[in-house]
Structure formats: structure tokens, C-alpha cells
């Protein structure tokens, strides 16, 4: 005996599989973009740390040598 709902179920399953494949592709693309953003953020964080350390070293050297002046 043939299931009368089989064709409908097969169609629904095919749509689900197609949607899941598209979703997986979208998630993979999102992950790639997030990785690029994270790389850029790491680079910006490193630059910020370098600037902060440079500022501290400059302030220390100016204070140590006695060449530090007040703000203009």
C-alpha cells in the first residue's frame, strides 16, 4: 500500500535540505567575514598597545632627562 502523503513529505524534505545547505553556506561566509574582522581588530589592538607603550616611554624619558614641559 502506497503512502498518500509520501510525495508531499519528499517535497518538504527536499525543501528542508535545500534550505539547510543554503544556511550552511551563509554561516560559512559569515565565519570567514568574522575571521577577517577579528584579524583587523587584533591588528588595531596591537597598534593601540604600541602607541600606548610609546607614549609611556616618551613620558618616562622626558621626565628622566628633565625635558618635560607642561601642555601648551
UniProtKB/Swiss-Prot annotation:
It is found in: Nucleus; Cytoplasm, Cytoskeleton, Spindle; Chromosome, Centromere, Kinetochore. Keywords: Cell cycle, Cell division, Centromere, Chromosome, Chromosome partition, Coiled coil, Cytoplasm, Cytoskeleton, Kinetochore, Microtubule, Mitosis, Nucleus. InterPro entries: DASH_Dad4. Pfam families: DASH_Dad4. The keyword Coiled coil applies. One of its GO terms (cellular component) is cytoplasm. Component of the DASH complex consisting of ASK1, DAD1, DAD2, DAD3, DAD4, DAM1, DUO1, HSK3, SPC19 and SPC34, with a stoichiometry of one copy of each subunit per complex. Multiple DASH complexes oligomerize to form a ring that encircles spindle microtubules and organizes the rod-like NDC80 complexes of the outer kinetochore. DASH complex oligomerization strengthens microtubule attachments. On cytoplasmic microtubules, DASH complexes appear to form patches instead of rings. Component of the DASH complex that connects microtubules with kinetochores and couples microtubule depolymerisation to chromosome movement; it is involved in retrieving kinetochores to the spindle poles before their re-orientation on the spindle in early mitosis and allows microtubule depolymerization to pull chromosomes apart and resist detachment during anaphase. Belongs to the DASH complex DAD4 family. This is DASH complex subunit DAD4.
Amino acid at each position: 500500500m502506497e503512502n498518500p502523503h509520501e510525495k508531499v513529505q519528499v517535497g518538504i524534505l527536499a525543501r528542508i535540505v535545500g534550505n539547510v545547505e543554503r544556511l550552511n553556506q551563509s554561516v560559512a561566509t559569515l565565519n570567514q567575514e568574522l575571521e577577517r574582522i577579528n584579524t583587523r581588530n587584533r591588528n588595531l589592538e596591537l597598534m593601540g598597545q604600541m602607541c600606548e607603550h610609546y607614549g609611556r616611554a616618551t613620558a618616562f624619558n622626558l621626565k628622566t632627562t628633565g625635558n618635560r614641559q607642561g601642555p601648551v
